[in-house]
């Protein structure tokens, strides 16, 4: 007997009709989006005559002349919020306004947080173990990012690192005070700043310090980090522009032989430090403070990392990331104080009135808001990573009337944004007062949903924003306050204002190099006596640490 098919209820009929209508609307909307994508044009691009290399010769020439940041600033002024350059087979898009950053890096973070393929830096020098170079979709990136936050850079741990920062900067003041020749020679001064930044972070990560300015480990770590960062710059390695070169036999790829040799050397160096820390723990001789590596060792899950050896390698990468940006920021601050002595004098008076005859500490920052303004302006004026570390897109990104295609490389062009006169009037001048009333930390400012209210873009934007902002605030604040309190900052004899930044270019675009004509001199015998007394007391109370060597 045939079964009677039940008729749908009135409610079900209405629901099916609504669902069908929604499907049609979604289909039409998708079709319109596809049509819109097809209609939208790519952003503008500077003209170039070289069909094969594109803009690569122009970019490489600018890099050789230490003017890469200026070239991309010029193009931003000519072509607007977004433009692209063709570097061989690769298109690099530069994001040059705060609103474009908000739309592309923040709101579209799920599609703009991957990294390009860096054959030399990521795959060969780092063997895909460097947090900075990994794509955000990779398991290793997620586990390393989590371990970094919970093991080193969260607010509580940033505060826990203050005793090391205070000791190392105090040692720096004492070293320059006891050896005036160090303060008069830029190379020696650069090394002294490097010592205290590396020692501050190696103490927190490995429980091993860097007691001497001439320690080979300073140059070793700096050179290791520089090799990785330079390999991320547009056009630095031709194999990253023309990937087909990677298919050559090894004997025709000197860059790969050198890169893999570097990784082997660096990984062995990190494993040696791990072995040292483990032996200290086993012998009951480890420093009493909890280090990053010790947290990883004692955590049953190693803070989510794959191995202790990989954790040690991450530790080295964190020293590089924290120390090098801290040193570059301090060096650029000195350039600003030389170039704008009125700002230097005002900042020094503010410090003197707040702390008197004692050495400043981080907690004094809340009492001297002008110093926070100086910090913000320093980072705006000389961003340590001027052109941003490139991201890649995982789908087409629409911004206004432009389409950035899937697979494109995108740069947050901090240098150009920081030089936008509509955002920062008179951008070439160093004017801390432009941040008057802004008492926010770097984290608070970067999290502002109103992008026009953010102080600067030094820490990036979106999902990949630098997790070290709490650490950076403390490191930079203590350095700035103590240098101003302790020293006269003056030009090298024979040097006159205005300074030409192109006469002392640094390794990183837009930042000063070792030829910076700076001299630090202790302000008075009384200041020197205070420094000596406080340093002697700090030495007596400080826990014993073995040196970082290798």
Swiss-Prot record:
Its induction note reads: Expression is negaticely regulated by the global nitrogen regulator areA.
Give the keywords, sorted.
Answer: Heme, Iron, Metal-binding, Monooxygenase, Oxidoreductase, Signal
- The keyword Iron appears for this protein: yes
Alphabetical list of SUPFAM superfamilies matching this protein: Cytochrome P450
Quote the disruption phenotype from the UniProt entry: Does not alter the amount of produced r-N-DMAT.
Q: Where is this region: Disordered?
A: 430-451
Which one of the record's GO molecular function terms can you name?
iron ion binding
- Any one Pfam family here would be p450
Tell me which InterPro entries the record gives: Cyt_P450 (IPR001128), Cyt_P450_CS (IPR017972), Cyt_P450_E_grp-I (IPR002401), Cyt_P450_sf (IPR036396), Cytochrome_P450_fung (IPR050364)
Q: What is its EC number?
A: 1.-.-.-
Q: Which residues does heme bind? A: 466
EC class (word): oxidoreductase
State the signal peptide span: 1-31
Question: Where are stretches of biased composition, namely Basic and acidic residues?
Answer: 430-441
The entry's family comment says: Belongs to the cytochrome P450 family.
Instruction: Give the protein's biological function.
Output: Cytochrome P450 monooxygenase; part of the DMATS1 gene cluster that mediates the biosynthesis of a reversely N-prenylated monomeric L-tryptophan (r-N-DMAT). Seems not to contribute to the final DMATS1 product.
Q: What is this protein called?
A: Cytochrome P450 monooxygenase FFUJ_09176
